[in-house]
Design a protein with these regions (language model features):
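Transmembrane alpha-helical segments of polytopic membrane transport and secretion proteins
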Residues: 1-48, 287-304
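Hydrophobic alpha-helical transmembrane segments of membrane transport/permease proteins
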Residues: 2, 7, 11, 15, ...
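Transmembrane alpha-helix signature in integral membrane proteins
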Residues: 91-126, 279
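Generic hydrophobic transmembrane alpha-helix motif, especially the helices
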Residues: 81, 85, 115-116, 125-191, ...
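Transmembrane alpha-helices
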Residues: 100-116, 145, 151, 205-237, ...
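Glycine-rich helix-loop "coupling/hinge" segments at transmembrane-helix boundaries
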Residues: 143, 154-157, 169, 183-185, ...
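C-terminal transmembrane helix and the adjacent membrane-cytosol boundary/short C-terminal tail
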Residues: 169-172, 218, 222-228, 267-304
Length: 304
């Protein structure tokens, strides 16, 4: 009995001690958000500047981008900050208006490629069989060629214009989404929550739309963000080769092509080329930041 009282007394004393004077709890180290990194801030600022330029291009551009009323090949000055081109057009105004072509079209083709590739990859990965074989063989066929070469062939067959250039870039871009999504679906379809839903009588389309879609959103969003820079580069490359935007459109790739005819007037090609470079870098920074924010393993590494 005394032993029992002694034991209970010790336990109660320990409980009272723990209640009155709790053990010091280990402080949780605050995590560093990926969106506060210098690269993320730089990317967001650049993208924000380009978006403002695209929305308010008519208000902030100093001149009409198509007006030919100044001396040709005028070097950068206080009157024309980026100089003039071979037709006497203000390059700054053309670069600003170029955001209205490059950025919306890049976003459009990435959305199209993402939707097509995600749907085909999810269907191929979940149902398998002949559907999987056909989709993956088509994807392998597209990926067997360099993207720019295949895009050039498609535009050459359909005719050189901006619409066909967008279509060509979509054709060369969707297989990447299809392969990534297929791999994710092959892994997720063996998960317990998917098997449970199937046992309850859910159809394959319901499983894809309800169970798997939320798990695919993060990786697909990261891939799309990274693909925006590639889309800008491919569209500009096709326009540089004369297969995309046609004169007198103020498109960055076409402007670089115009400047390649006269290396003495370096500003004609340098400023639109710098716009391409900055936009590609900004979208890559955005994609990397989004990946770090959505990937728990990367987030833990950042907090360390």
């Amino acid at each position: 009995m005394n032993a029992t009282r002694l034991f209970l007394g010790d336990r109660l004393g320990a409980d009272r001690t723990g209640t009155d004077d709790p053990a010091p709890r280990r402080k949780r180290r605050p995590g560093k958000s990926p969106w506060r990194s210098p690269l993320a801030i730089t990317g967001l600022v650049i993208i924000g500047v380009f978006l403002i330029a695209a929305i308010f291009a008519s208000l902030i551009s100093p001149e009409d981008p198509l007006a030919q009323k100044w001396p040709k090949y005028q070097s950068p000055s206080g009157e024309h900050w980026f100089g003039t081109d071979q037709l006497g057009r203000d390059i700054l105004s053309r670069v600003i208006h170029g955001t209205r072509i490059s950025l919306p079209l890049a976003l459009l083709l990435v959305v199209l490629a993402m939707v097509i590739g995600t749907v085909l990859g999810a269907v191929a990965g979940y149902f398998g069989g002949w559907i999987d074989m056909i989709v993956m063989r088509c994807a392998d066929l597209v990926l067997a060629f360099p993207a720019i070469i295949l895009a050039m062939a498609v535009v050459a067959a359909l005719g050189p214009n901006l619409t066909n250039a967008v279509l060509a870039v979509v054709i060369v871009s969707w297989p990447t989404y299809a392969r990534v999504v297929r791999g994710l679906v092959l892994t997720l379809r063996q998960s317990d929550f998917v098997q449970a839903d199937r046992l309850l009588g859910a159809s394959g389309w319901r499983v894809l739309a309800v169970d798997l879609r939320p798990n695919l959103a993060g990786p697909v969003a990261v891939l799309a963000a990274l693909d925006l820079g590639n889309a800008v580069l491919l569209l500009s490359g096709l326009s540089f080769l004369g297969l995309g935007a046609q004169p007198p459109a103020a498109e960055w790739g076409a402007m670089v092509n115009a400047g390649s005819a006269n290396f003495d007037a370096w500003w004609v090609a340098v400023f639109p080329g710098a716009a391409i470079l900055l936009s590609v870098l900004a979208f890559n920074f955005l994609g990397d930041t989004l990946r770090d924010a959505l990937d728990p393993r990367t987030a833990r590494a950042i907090r360390k």
